[in-house]
Amino acid sequence: MKPLNIIFAGTPDFAARHLQALLNSHHNVIGVYTQPDRPAGRGKKLTASPVKELAVANNIPVYQPGSLRKEPAQQELAALNADIMVVVAYGLILPKVVLDTPRLGCINVHGSILPRWRGAAPIQRALWAGDKETGVTVMQMDVGLDTGDMLLKTTLPIEDSDTSASLYEKLAEQGPVALLQALEGLVNGTLAAEKQDEALANYAEKLSKEEARLDWNKSAQQLWQEVRAFNPWPVSYFEHQGNTIKVWQTQVSETTSTAAPGTIISASKKGIEVATADGVLTLLNMQLPGKKPLNVADILNARGEWFSPNTRLANEAQ
């Protein structure tokens, strides 16, 4: 298989894993595009993306335009004379002129089985919706948002123990393998492009902190899915005793209750059971303000009086 001259475009750690796979392959990465350096941390110091750091460490030219809509940036990209552009969580829109510039166009690695979850948060939305599987799709990019023809798909079962953090890690391992397979298939002409079924498409909206507020008027099953989806960010929470209490781990209890949603049914070192609109949710790991996440046994040792049975937890949706 003849080596390809590749432009790579990506920004976060998830993308850097794919760049590393390309660097380890026989292909040539001739240029890297990534988002401009951003202020980060308490000191708001300008910080390079993980992709930029990896590219610099490997002496690969780095390009950080604020947009690819302007002609000078487009001409600069065209001058690289790439065979293909690989895009992974880049964060900038690619206009048609850019998509058409490389000989083989632009391909994207997306963290879901398309067309199920298009958009910014496919890993989180799969958990949020209670999906039984997820995976990676490599697609030929077009001007739409994750609407291009699918070149290769891999699947992965979603376990009850999975959170967004664990799925992210699994897909960050699966994605680079799929990418290299897709590049080989493109060169060999063995990939059959598959159109997406628009009727099956959903948009995976970005998560918000407000959305992470636990609404006890939902079912225990839905809240369990949300807690897993919002771990590690923005982290599910509820207001109680004037404090925001984060919830990192829960499970659906076999206990039944007719108590009003948000009512504590029981509190022991095994968990705090809370009534919901449908079923009972057991809180297993929580975080008090300014503290580290703790198992419920330690929370009760510190603030047991907050979680007495029959206490009603705050809920703005009451």
UniProtKB/Swiss-Prot annotation:
GO molecular function list: methionyl-tRNA formyltransferase activity
Regions that span the bilayer: none
Sequence positions that bind (6S)-5,6,7,8-tetrahydrofolate: S112, I113, L114, P115
EC number: 2.1.2.9
One cellular component term from this protein's GO annotations in UniProt: cytosol
Catalyzed reaction equations: L-methionyl-tRNA(fMet) + (6R)-10-formyltetrahydrofolate = N-formyl-L-methionyl-tRNA(fMet) + (6S)-5,6,7,8-tetrahydrofolate + H(+)
UniProt xrefs under Pfam families: Formyl_trans_C, Formyl_trans_N
Organism domain of life: Bacteria
SUPFAM superfamilies to which the protein is assigned, alphabetical: FMT C-terminal domain-like, Formyltransferase
Database matches in Gene3D superfamilies: Formyl transferase, C-terminal domain, Formyl transferase, N-terminal domain
Family note: Belongs to the Fmt family.
UniProt function note: Attaches a formyl group to the free amino group of methionyl-tRNA(fMet). The formyl group appears to play a dual role in the initiator identity of N-formylmethionyl-tRNA by promoting its recognition by IF2 and preventing the misappropriation of this tRNA by the elongation apparatus.
Protein name: Methionyl-tRNA formyltransferase
Native species: Shewanella baltica (strain OS195)
